[in-house]
């Protein structure tokens, strides 16, 4: 399935979603941002994309601490779906728990801690966009 120039951002914090979306659009206005407030919304969106045979996102950015379905469980469900295996996932979280990092390192997933400064944020957005560009097809 073809990938798009679209990033799926999954975070229950509306302010973080807005900030991340704006930062991505500032650097890459051609990148479409799709937002989901939890893992269930994200999985529903991905199932709809597959059902419609639409292009998959070039990247999924997941928060870890979310209601209904947390980031780890969402990630596990995404990676259990053969059609989604090739879509890279990056974790963008306020968690500083070493076990969270260890879990995702097993899967070669980049984990970004939500930054305290604009400079750190810009660096993270650049890394996220490079992940997306390497996958867009």
Where are these regions (language model features)?
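Alpha4 helix (beta4-alpha4-beta5 surface) of REC/receiver domains from two-component response regulators
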Residues: 73, 95-112, 119, 123
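Two-component/phosphorelay signaling modules centered on CheY-like receiver
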Residues: 14-38
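Hydrophobic/aromatic residues positioned on beta-strands within the core alpha/beta folds
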Residues: 90-92
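Helix N-cap/capping motif at the beta->alpha junctions
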Residues: 35-48, 71
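Active-site residues of response regulator receiver
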Residues: 62-63
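Short amphipathic alpha-helix used as the core "switch/output" element in two-component signaling
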Residues: 44, 72-85
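His-Asp phosphorelay/catalytic-motif detector in bacterial-type signaling
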Residues: 3, 30, 55-58, 83-88
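Receiver (REC) domain active-site loop signature in two-component systems and cognate sites
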Residues: 66
